[in-house]
């Protein structure tokens, strides 16, 4: 303890000594500061003040020079970064800039070499160029101007760029070598200036020295010829055909044979009619049509929509000459002709769309971003091409040897992050290609007009009245479909996805292609406002139905119509309604003797339900049973259903409905579950809305992505007005009338010992006009189960409507009909 105390005291002593020494130093240092305080009138402080002023001035100048230097450095760096970002300029602007630079150089070179007018800089440029290419400098302005014009008048084609550069280089080098040989192969520098310069000497000199000029000249000529073939993009074997096509010497029958390859037995001279290939739904009535004269005006507007509207990185493979031949065939496509006084509305009433957009700098940036993601995750794959569609661009990724497809699909979220979008959809693989497709939305979407779809070549070639325009796919092809081949369609999509626009496009397509004698419609619109513009069109069987109960009755009437058609086809021994109509027109079949009926061709019937969910909530059993019966066997009878819904849940789109409706069209859905309900697979939840959809026709394994066609309210009004001006609707009686109650027994009608209680319940409900189970419990003093059974018995006899959840049931019997209803019930009970 004593040692510790001594150590502590020693430590305190040393600290105190150090403190005293520090204090003495501070005291000594404080004394001189007091002595060095400046005194007025003494010269020594003034010299120090003069030196401090010089130092301050120097420091200020240094700071100013540093600021100027930093500003210059920042300006230079900003300019360099701006120049580096020049690659983000649109390809068209970049090509125009290069072309204008070439024109400027052509002017300078022409002034210096032709007129000796651009001194002193022009003399230096002329001397430099003559050193390299000699007297060929006089042709350089013409070549530069020609290249500039080509750049300004053509679109970029990255695939052909190496071929063009190599071809131009071969032509230029061979020409300089020939010029050197023509000038006598001079070796002196002064003589080379008047020949082909240093380049001509380097090309032609070794050839002439080693092989003589007589052999060198043909070799150089062959090199120039090969360069010319590269520029033209043809081979030697194709030269004769190219010359014939250039000078118009191709034989006309061969050209027409190419143009009319889809028609049968056409000789190009004296054919007045052509017969379109019979489809499986055709009855021969729409097959034979007169051939339009070549001199006559086209039936549709002459505005052509380019077919080749895709751009790729590099461009996706396409048939050569497809655009030229496609345009030539469009002029020969025959339009549909109908019989009778009714005239189809002209497609001039519809608005044509803008030309398709080409590849932009954004597509190049997206391809680079996808490639960087693959590189960062060390996946042996590369972006080999892209195809731009109206809504999305599909980038094709080819995998290296031994790379699993799952490595690409697992990077979906990383690729979405790289391209700064959520709606990235992968297609592994692309149908018909050994590549994985990555679909990325375009920042500049294009609108697909219904007029362009209906005037497309493939749509006009199909003369069936049930052909509807769908839209345009990623490849840039217009997509149409035949309802007779579907034969029923299920459409689903959330709010704003484009479902209502599709229904409008489908109806306008039918109105512009079919007469009321060919197609009749039943429009069911529980939302009351979607199909209002079509009220009064002559194609309607009954006025537009807005009440769910009447809709269920209309579907039941459609079942009866289907059964009647099958009975007629059975009696006529035909299997399809088209065959029946064909025989009726030809007089091959007539009504049986003694019958009051008269056989007439049956029109196609298209029933469109705009919101299936409302019907399924009101009368699920009746609606589902009718839909299932129609979809199971109505195809041969010419009856087709189009079911649309915003809520594709399992209680709306039931298993029986899905099984019997093979064709599906899904727009953007709110969840993966909805996508699987409508398509039986994922994908619809990745769509971006506004007409972006997936079409899964009957028999297809993978859906086709397309942009739905758009038709405006003004176009709808114009087409509907044109239809109303020609005919009035002829409504059929009894379509929305419900069947007698005796036929609508879904619950066991045996009342048993509860007759008195049941009569009291009926009297109570009818007199109060309030169908509530809880009211029966209170008034009759029965349990919930018995009150519910009484309500079900009243529903089977048509006294109350179906259950609507927690709401009271609708009472269908009026108080003044109570006596007759009670008498009918007593009669039932007595049986």
UniProtKB/Swiss-Prot annotation:
GO molecular function terms listed in the Swiss-Prot or TrEMBL record: ATP binding; DNA binding; DNA translocase activity
Bias type Low complexity, positions: 7-30
Membrane topology reported for the UniProt record: Multi-pass membrane protein
Entries under CDD domains matching the protein: TrwB_TraG_TraD_VirD4 (cd01127)
Keyword set, alphabetical order: ATP-binding, Cell cycle, Cell division, Cell membrane, Chromosome partition, DNA-binding, Membrane, Nucleotide-binding, Transmembrane, Transmembrane helix
Protein location: Cell membrane
Keyword Cytoplasm: no
One GO cellular component term: peptidoglycan-based cell wall
Highest rank taxon of the organism: Bacteria
Regions of this protein lying in the Cytoplasmic compartment: 235-831
Domain FtsK: 476-676
InterPro entries xref list: FtsK/SpoIIIE/SftA (IPR050206), FtsK_4TM (IPR025199), FtsK_alpha (IPR041027), FtsK_dom (IPR002543), Ftsk_gamma (IPR018541), P-loop_NTPase (IPR027417), WH-like_DNA-bd_sf (IPR036388), WH_DNA-bd_sf (IPR036390)
Keyword Zinc-finger: no
Region (Disordered): 1-48, 296-331
Pfam families given in the database record: FtsK_4TM, FtsK_alpha, FtsK_gamma, FtsK_SpoIIIE
Single GO biological process annotation from the record: cell division
SMART domains for the chain: Ftsk_gamma (SM00843)
Annotated domain remarks: Consists of an N-terminal domain, which is sufficient for the localization to the septal ring and is required for cell division, followed by a linker domain, and a C-terminal domain, which forms the translocation motor involved in chromosome segregation. The C-terminal domain can be further subdivided into alpha, beta and gamma subdomains. The alpha and beta subdomains form the DNA pump, and the gamma subdomain is a regulatory subdomain.
Note from the entry: Was identified as a high-confidence drug target.
Family statement: Belongs to the FtsK/SpoIIIE/SftA family.
Function: Essential cell division protein that coordinates cell division and chromosome segregation. The N-terminus is involved in assembly of the cell-division machinery. The C-terminus functions as a DNA motor that moves dsDNA in an ATP-dependent manner towards the dif recombination site, which is located within the replication terminus region. Required for activation of the Xer recombinase, allowing activation of chromosome unlinking by recombination.
Assembly with partners or alone: Homohexamer. Forms a ring that surrounds DNA.
Identification of the protein by name: DNA translocase FtsK
Gene responsible for this protein: ftsK
